[in-house]
Amino acid sequence: MLNKFKPGEILLSLAKPNKKKIANIADFSNVSLNLSFADLNDLSFNIPLKARYNFLMKPNHVAKLMREWYLIKAEFLNRVEWFVITGLTKSENEEQTIQVRCQGLPYILHKNKIRSYQGVSKNLQEVATDCLKGTRLNIGYIDPSFNEKRRSFDVTSTRYEFLKTIWETFEAVPVFDTVKNTVSFYKKDTVSKYKGVQFSPERFMIDMEDTIDIDEVVTRLNITGKDGIVINSVNPTGQSYLDDFSYFLYPFKRDKNRNVITHSDYMDDDLCHAILDYNELVNKEGSSFHLLLNQKRDLETQKTTQENKLFTLENIELQQILDKITVAKKAGDDTKDLIKQRDAKLLEVTAKKAEISRINSQITNISQEIEKLKDRLSMDKFLGEELKKQLSYFIFEDDWTNDNIFDETELYEKGLEELSNRNAPPVDIRTNIVNLFNVNSEKAFWDRIYLGDIIRVVNKNFRTDVKATLSGMTFDFDQQSIQVTLSNGKRARSLEQEFANTLYTTKKASTEYNKKKIDYDTLLVNYNARNDRISSPVANPTILNNGTAITHVVNDNGSVDISIEWQFPNSKEDKYNIDGFLVHCYSDTSSDTYIFGSKMSSEQYLSVSYDKRIATLTGQVSNKYYTFGIQAYRTVEASIDSSGRILSDIIQPQFPSENPYLPSNSVEVKGSLSGRVNGLYTISTEAKPEDPEKGTIWINPKNNKQELFNGEEWVVSSAGSADSLNGFTASTTTSPNSIPVRNESGIISGSIDGNAEMLGGRAASDYALAENIPIPPKFAKGIYTGDGTLSKQIPLTFTPDLVKITPISPEDSQLVIESQLGGYAYQVTSTGLSLIGGDLGYGALGNNLFVTGSDSNCRGNKLNVKYIWEAYQQN
């Protein structure tokens, strides 16, 4: 328990590399502790070469024990962090000290290298396991969404650099636990929350430095993906770059008659008018460009297919007939039938050439339309020479590449995100605050200010009002102050500013229905080069229809490893001569049947070699529905198929419980768990944690007892075994025949017989009878995606008294249902919020279920809208 000193102070001790403590460090000075969000912490301090022992100055025994690569245990802010000593500097001066320099314990990964690692289609758990294999660090918690994504890696670096590449690739936030030697991976919005803390000159702030760097602003971003792909085909302007001049346009505003209401701080009115006019043109005609490009791409695909067929007709089939005619003539055989075959084949060749010519003509026409549209959407032509020169002053150009993205649609969407993060000067604020962790009156803030938290900084003199991530903390324990760095945030905007900003940029192109690409070039490995000339179609795999094709194993952290098996003949026939199988997987909270290709951005792909008949997806969420598909493939030469591959159909399981497959209705956790549940740390171990954080829940697996650490002590929140009743321990002396019968888990499972009159010193009348104890209220919640049907029924395990349905979309309203006769929706009136409805069109309650709206408005069940529901039963 770290309650012997104030959280704002620091305790240090020295340990060997196995963490065995060998000395407390009582005499130290000039401590500098730098904490960094999503990176390594560092620590430095001085210790004297001599120390006072019983009023005598003697050589400091700690200085003698100090070694590089030993460990330092630091206790501060009710936390424990381990550091590795990376340097010692001995100074023979007036003070005679040793400066000790340390890095966070994960620094040891810098000393171990990965050479030529290649991982294809790996989720975060798989690639992180490869990275940490054989090291002291293990994987802790992984947000389930990261195991539903797959990325490929080609790395030669230190293990720490590799680990950093992993979390950056998956856009995860690493959290190192140097006590348990683990690294966990969270979504940023999970660890970065605004807890209502504000720094200002009136509150905590000593001084402040707010840096605005225009060099960091980007208004034009050139975007490329894997193998140089660009966004022209999905960008409404048809360009390979994105523009956003909103920072320099603000606060320009005009009415519908083009009268200027507010001038821009930077741009002339003529230029502002021209940019807004251009945006309106792009919003109006940009979709036409996308449609034309899709038509051209489809025609080019058709052309390639027909050219392949022409090659087969002309260079293979016709040539075979001509060879037969030559042989027949030399042998003096009749060639009449062969000549008929030749003439018929020549007619096929002529027809195929005519078809290709027609497609070429269509491609030419569409190309001309595209060029005309490009000309109309050319910003340079639209602005003219004079305005183009004015705009050039505000074009801050940069390049952005993401080699993990091979699909134009995903690249376009990620490019928009990147530009939105760089279209204004980044937040870079450094401020010194008082060390409030030493002030008992500020105790309420102790667990609300730490790395990753979002802090609001307000300074009226600087006109600063910003919410940003607390990315760094430097403690000066001698001066009782903390230097805080805040970054990666946005300057506060009013609603008027937010609305104005939507006018300054073109609308995002709708990409919801775009077919996304599969990275076949990376996924499909040529395991068998001897079949590259086989042009025969590939046979379909088969999946047993008896419910045994899919199985799963529950991991200690509650995730599951799901395996699917299939069948495919081992045969030398061409149709069975393949390179491998591509496993498709889609997960959802809905039990609806899924067709592959519907939401390709949410699909996972895994490639296995031709000799395998089973594949396993690791670290998946246990209470989701999984749809699997198996596809056989053969990689071939381009002359056989221009795509370089021949694919079978995607075969899905047909057994009802396997299409889709639900591993479990809930998340089952066993063994040792370290992770967040509803914002709290949950740990399930036989031994009670020694240095818990506030809010830690400990579950004793022996008796299922739960205890919550409130920052000072453990509080029992529930008990699996009956050790007491209403706080009184059962008395066996006053009531001789009181015999509790427990099962192997420690839970009372038998009845208590005899004539006992007392229990825990209380008479029977002091205790309530079961029939007099009120039944506790029931509650359930869940998520579903609307399918557009009327009166959709959602089953429950109890009959509800009240149901709330909240859409995660502005396309629908929240429903409040408290009757079998109908529900209500909120409406905004001049006096505030009120309810409207009262009929079945707004949903209804039922026995062990609730029902969504019954009319054509489909309230509570609009197509593709996601809903969160809550059901209550009051007793």
Swiss-Prot record:
Keywords, in A-Z order: Coiled coil
Annotated signal sequence range: none
Segments forming domain Fibronectin type-III: 537-648
Coiled coil: 351-381
Superkingdom, taxonomy of origin: Bacteria
One protein family per Pfam: DUF7359
Record flagged with keyword Ion transport: no
InterPro entries in UniProt: DUF7359, DUF7360, DUF7361
Protein's name according to its UniProt entry: SPbeta prophage-derived uncharacterized protein YomG
Organism: Bacillus subtilis (strain 168)
Lineage: Bacteria, Bacillati, Bacillota, Bacilli, Bacillales
Gene encoding the protein: yomG
